[in-house]
């Protein structure tokens, strides 16, 4: 530390180590990120005739994986728009045209990083579980892709891994597949001019938090094909329309909620500061204030689970 260096004297040798490798897919600083967009790092794996794509946003902790057919790779890259894709050199040589057409930066890792047996050990070690069945029945390609992401994070973060949510399978068959050309012409998230302004997303985005903006972008980019999911979202919209006063009050409260996901991520990587700690405290206080308001609403199951986590943090709030 600077204090220790001063004690040793100006002529003493101070040990310096590389503590982080900065890459497009591993950014956590607010000044380098769009508040309302995810910054995904992806890994693509091939095990025999099976393919899988995993992606992570270390600034928010999101970790997902999807088994897919090769024909689905282009649409998935267009949907996620990852800042960086990790893959083995042999896979890149075989499929370079797909990644070049998608316009995503790629990074090569050794074949050992994609070994499914070693990948399983990495995942179990990171999440401290005895078996991957705790998260789902991942096939070898999915396990390989997840393990490669963890290995790459271990390399770039020099052993200081971020706080990640348990891996979730995001089956591509459950959402609408939209190829890059169609997505561009529909101007879903970007206008033909290249910016966000003028797109469908910019037109309908009335969210008041950064996390809400990111969620809307993801849902708009991948429209659900599941009837129960669609009906549940419609019931929540009906709830909002039938309770205008409560919704206005809730939106006013949400405007004061900071970006908790990114604050937590920076703190877990030891890159945070007093402002991030204050954001956690303020966010928990806002959640506590929302609890009575949500109790007055005719909550659907999707909100009942969320509502249960809003309280019980008094000791932590006082400590922070």
Labelled PLM ranges:
Residues 1-239, 255-268, 272-320:
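Charged catalytic and DNA/RNA-contacting regions of genome-maintenance
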Residues 241-246:
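Conserved interaction-surface patches within small, structured recognition/assembly domains
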Residues 251:
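Aromatic-lined, polymer-binding surfaces characteristic
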């Amino acid at each position: 530390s600077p204090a220790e260096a001063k004690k040793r004297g100006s002529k003493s040798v101070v040990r310096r180590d590389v503590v982080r490798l900065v890459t497009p897919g591993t950014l956590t600083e607010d000044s380098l990120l769009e508040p309302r967009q995810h910054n995904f790092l992806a890994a693509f794996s091939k095990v025999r005739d099976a393919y899988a794509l995993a992606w992570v946003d270390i600034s928010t902790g999101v970790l997902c994986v999807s088994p897919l057919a090769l024909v689905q790779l282009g649409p998935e890259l267009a949907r996620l728009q990852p800042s960086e894709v990790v893959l083995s050199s042999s896979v890149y040589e075989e499929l370079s045209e797909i990644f070049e057409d998608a316009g995503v930066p790629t990074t090569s890792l050794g074949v050992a990083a994609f070994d499914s047996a070693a990948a399983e050990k990495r995942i179990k070690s990171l999440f401290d579980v005895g078996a991957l069945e705790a998260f789902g029945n991942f096939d070898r390609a999915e396990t390989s892709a997840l393990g490669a992401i963890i290995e790459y994070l271990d390399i770039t973060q020099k052993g200081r891994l971020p706080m990640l949510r348990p891996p979730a399978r995001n089956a591509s068959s459950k959402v609408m597949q939209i190829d890059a050309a169609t997505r561009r012409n529909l101007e879903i998230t970007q206008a033909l001019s290249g910016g966000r302004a003028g797109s469908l997303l910019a037109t309908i985005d009335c969210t008041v938090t950064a996390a809400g903006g990111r969620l809307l972008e993801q849902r708009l980019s991948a429209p659900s094909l599941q009837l129960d999911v669609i009906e549940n979202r419609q019931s929540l919209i009906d709830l909002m329309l039938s309770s205008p006063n409560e919704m206005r009050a809730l939106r006013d409260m949400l405007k004061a909620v900071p970006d908790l996901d990114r604050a937590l991520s920076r703190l877990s990587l030891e890159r945070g500061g007093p402002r991030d700690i204050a954001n956690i405290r303020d966010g928990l206080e806002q959640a506590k204030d929302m609890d009575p308001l949500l109790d007055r609403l005719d909550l659907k199951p999707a909100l009942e689970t969320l509502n249960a986590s809003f309280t019980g943090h008094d000791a932590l709030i006082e400590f922070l």
